[in-house]
Amino acid sequence: NDTLTVQVQNNKTWRDYIGVHFGTPKITVYLPEREYAMLTVHENTGNVEIPKDFAFTGADISVTTGNVRFFADVQDAKIKTSTGDIQVEDLSTGSLDLSVTTGKIMVSGVTCQGDVALSVSTGKTALTDITCRNLRSNGTTGTISLERVLADEAISVERSTGDVRFNGCDAAELSVKTGTGNVTGSLLTEKI
């Protein structure tokens, strides 16, 4: 059914974990450069990197502990990690939904036809050179910096604790809420 499934099954007993061990398992999957339908990755511990040579109609990536680096064009992407960083660069997308419990979100060079949604419980968010319809970011603890972020409709940022920094950003509507933190920066047009 044109589906590639890769699984690692651990058949070790507790005795296999006694002693000094070097190295961790690593899986590299090579595919022809072309557009694929859905990319689904569910990983407990490990890093995931998707290079720019691919295109997908959808991507659903979930990692418990590890970093995700995503560079491929995708129609709709949902990337989540509990502990780790998410890096998205130089791609076109229909929608982008990124979520980190503890870690950083770094997005740069993204053209999004729809909405960008970002959620960070604890960690920094850095957004650079993004165009989209709407951008929504919420978080508990951590600084968010937006540089040259342009939204056709709205930019909404909420933080419990942390600074919000704008540099050369704009949207028809702008909403910023922070419990403890400073809001600084520059917008391209005046807001009331």
Predicted feature locations:
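Acidic (Asp/Glu) and glycine-rich low-complexity loops/linkers
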Residues: 1-63, 67-81, 85-100, 104-120, ...
